[in-house]
Design a protein with these regions (language model features):
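Dynamic "connector" segments at or just before major functional cores
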Residues: 1-179, 183-191, 213-225, 444-470
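Short amphipathic alpha-helical "interface-anchor" segments enriched in bulky aromatics
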Residues: 363-391
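Secondary-structure capping and boundary motifs in well-ordered enzyme cores
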Residues: 110, 144, 148, 205-208, ...
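Basic, amphipathic alpha-helical segments enriched in Lys/Arg and hydrophobic/aromatic residues
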Residues: 393-416
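An anionic, glycine-rich sequence signature occurring as long contiguous blocks
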Residues: 207, 224-227, 270-369, 433-470
Length: 470
C-alpha cells in the first residue's frame, strides 16, 4: 500500500510542472489532461447515520496557468487576447543584443524602432498593415508607441544616417571574420535617385540599387548594410564600405561573374582579401594530383587538394555522382556526346576557389559556403521592398528602411542559430504565438501552453514572466 502511494506521488511530481504544482494547496489538487492543467478541490461530508465521512465529487476550480487559476466565470469575462509567446522570445533576444545599443544611440525613438523590428520578424507586412498586427500582439500592451503608417513613415525620415551607421558598427565585434557580398535590387519607384540602370548577373535592364552587406562568419549574423546607386559596383565602393563599418578582417565573397584579372588586381591594391569561385574551364586551375584529405560538411564528405597558385580545389562525391548521372542521361538522349563526357568528367563535383587567404582548406570552404546565408538575407530585402515602395519617398528613407530590416534580420539569425533545423524561424514564431495573454476586466492571465509551444519554451529558455514585469 505504501509502495503504491509512493509511486503515485513520484508520477504526480514528474508529470505536473513546478509552476503548476505551486497552486496545489491543502485540499486542492492539479490534474493533467492533454496539454492543460486543471485545479479541483476535494469535497466530503459526514454521514451521521453511517457514522463515517463520504467522499463527494470534486469541485472544479478552473484552468491552471502560470499567472494563477482561471475560474470559469473569469473566462467568460475575457475582454481581449494577445499573441504573447512569440513576443517574449523576440523581445528577450532584443534585450540581450540590439536594444541596449538602440537605447544609447536613439534614446527617444528606440521603442518605435524595436516594435517595428520585432513585428517584421513575426510577419513582414507592408507598412500600411503593421498597425493591425501590432494591436493583436502583446507589444501593444507594453508600449504606447503609435505604429500607424504615418508614424512609421515619420520614423524613416527622422533617423539620422550617421547614427544608424553607429548602431551597425556597434553590432560588429572586433577581430571577427566578416564576409562581404553585394546584390542588385530592382524597383520601379519614381522617388529614389539611387535607382539607376546597372550591371547585374541576370542582365536585367531595370532600374536597380546595389546593396552591400557585411556578414559575421564567426557568429553567422548580418551586421552592416550599405546602399549605392545602381551604376556603382566596383572595388573602391567595397573598400569604402569596409572603412565605414570599421571592420578589421573582411573577406570579399564574390560570384563567378565577378572574376577578372583586373578585378583581382584592384582587390590586391586595396589590400582586400577575397574568395572567388572560378569557372571550371578557367586557365588558372592547376592539374590536380592526389587529394590531400577529407572533411565533413553538412553531413557529407568533401575531398580537398593542396592549395596551388592561390587556387583551392574541392570535390563533393555526392554532387559528382549526380552530375555524372545527369550527363549520362543527356548522352542517352543524344544531347551530349561521349567525347564531351570525357572532357568534362574531371570537373564533376568540383569547386575551384581563388583566394589570397592563407588558411586551412576546410576554413576557406566554410567561409565560402556561408555566402548562402548572405543570399538568404538578401532575398528578404528583394521580397519586401516592392510592397513598401510607395512609402519610400527619397534616398534617406530607403537607407533607413534597409537599416531597420537589417536589425530585423539580426534577430532572425539569432533564432536561426539556436534552433536545430526541425523548425524554420517562421514555424517557431507561429508555434509560440499560440501562447496568449488574456486581458480581463482588472487583470491579465496567460493561456494554457500547448505541448509544442512548451517544448520550444524549454529548449529556447524563454522567460515567459519577463514581459509581465514591464
Amino acid at each position: 500500500m505504501y509502495l503504491y502511494a509512493w509511486y503515485v506521488y513520484v508520477y504526480y511530481m514528474d508529470t505536473i510542472p513546478a509552476w503548476a504544482l505551486k497552486y496545489k494547496t491543502r485540499g486542492v489538487y492539479i490534474r493533467n489532461v492533454g496539454n492543460n492543467y486543471y485545479a479541483y478541490r476535494t469535497r466530503s461530508r459526514w454521514v451521521k447515520e453511517e457514522k463515517r465521512t463520504k467522499t463527494l465529487p470534486p469541485e472544479y476550480l478552473g484552468v491552471v496557468t502560470r499567472n494563477g487559476i482561471v475560474r470559469k466565470d473569469q473566462v467568460m469575462g475575457i475582454r481581449s487576447d494577445y499573441e504573447y509567446g512569440n513576443i517574449a522570445l523576440l523581445y528577450g533576444i532584443a534585450e540581450r543584443t540590439i536594444l541596449p545599443v538602440l537605447k544609447e544611440v536613439y534614446p527617444y525613438l528606440y521603442g518605435r524602432i524595436i516594435n517595428y523590428v520585432i513585428l517584421r520578424n513575426i510577419q513582414p507586412l507592408p507598412m500600411k498593415s503593421i498597425r493591425y498586427l501590432y494591436e493583436k500582439t502583446y507589444l501593444s500592451r507594453i508600449s504606447d508607441e503609435s505604429m500607424s503608417p504615418a508614424s512609421i513613415s515619420g520614423m524613416l525620415s527622422s533617423l539620422p544616417e550617421d547614427r544608424s551607421i553607429s548602431v551597425m558598427r556597434k553590432l560588429t565585434e572586433k577581430g571577427e571574420y566578416v564576409l562581404m557580398d553585394s546584390t542588385a535590387i530592382f524597383s520601379r519607384s519614381e522617388n529614389i535617385s539611387f535607382l539607376e540602370p546597372g550591371h547585374n548577373p541576370k542582365e536585367m535592364h531595370l532600374p536597380q540599387i546595389n546593396v552591400m552587406m557585411l556578414f559575421s562568419a564567426t557568429r553567422t549574423m548580418p551586421t552592416f548594410i550599405r546602399i549605392l546607386p545602381g551604376s556603382i559596383r566596383d572595388v573602391s565602393a567595397m573598400a569604402n564600405t569596409i572603412d565605414m563599418a570599421g571592420v578589421e578582417k573582411c573577406v570579399i565573397v564574390a560570384d563567378k561573374g565577378f572574376f577578372s584579372a583586373e578585378n583581382v588586381n584592384k582587390l590586391r591594391k586595396k589590400h582586400l582579401s577575397y574568395i572567388i569561385p572560378l569557372r571550371r574551364n578557367s586557365s588558372l586551375i592547376p592539374e590536380p594530383d592526389h587529394f590531400m584529405g577529407v572533411f565533413m560538411y553538412d553531413g557529407k564528405p568533401v575531398k580537398y587538394w593542396k592549395r596551388e597558385n592561390d587556387v583551392y580545389i574541392y570535390e563533393d562525391p555526392v554532387l559528382k555522382s549526380e552530375e555524372e548521372k545527369d550527363y549520362l542521361i543527356r548522352i542517352e538522349e543524344n544531347k551530349r556526346s561521349r567525347k564531351q563526357f570525357d572532357e568534362n568528367e574531371i570537373n564533376f563535383g568540383k569547386l575551384y576557389l581563388l583566394s589570397d587567404l592563407n588558411e586551412e582548406p576546410e576554413r576557406v570552404y566554410r567561409l565560402y559556403k556561408q555566402r548562402e546565408y548572405v543570399e538568404y538575407a538578401f532575398n528578404v530585402y528583394k521580397n519586401d521592398l516592392e510592397a513598401d515602395r510607395s512609402y519610400l519617398r527619397d534616398d534617406h528613407m530607403l537607407f533607413t528602411y534597409m537599416f531597420l530590416n537589417l536589425l530585423s534580420l539580426y534577430l532572425h539569425f539569432q533564432i536561426l542559430n539556436i534552433i536545430d533545423g526541425k523548425y524554420s524561424v517562421r514555424d517557431v514564431l507561429l508555434i509560440l504565438s499560440r501562447i496568449k495573454m488574456y486581458r480581463m476586466e482588472k487583470s491579465e492571465i496567460m493561456s494554457e501552453i500547448p505541448k509544442k509551444s512548451r517544448e520550444l519554451v524549454e529548449k529556447l529558455e524563454i522567460d515567459l514572466d519577463m514581459l509581465c514585469k514591464k
